Amino acid sequence: MPGTGRHAAGIRGADARRITREVLAPHRVSERLLGDVLTVVGELVSNAIRHAGGVTAFDVRHLHDEVAVEVSDASPLLPHAAGTPVTVPGGFGWLLVNTMAARTEISVGADGKTITAYLSVTATMA
């Protein structure tokens, strides 16, 4: 599939961000969109590592009017916004992902879950 960054288990944040840059480079996305996508990639990958034992699959795709970031892990547990006080570091990743993404989808199966975040290309062109 053109424009895909499909990778297998064990990917770390730095590699996921590098792959994301490589996949999006031919599409000449705005710096703002690239920054948002890289933030979402970092949050989803680090959450999978921190809370679910690691990434089992990673993909990033440039679609016509959006960028899709897909991260799978082995946990069936759904992400949730932590009730962390603002004085305590961390706990804001899922909220951040949902703020930056136009929409998110979660599918749960026998092997864990896949979270897909869709970021609008047109919303960041202004």
Where are these regions (language model features)?
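Active-site rim helix/loop that mediates acceptor-substrate recognition in acyltransferases
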Residues: 41-45, 49
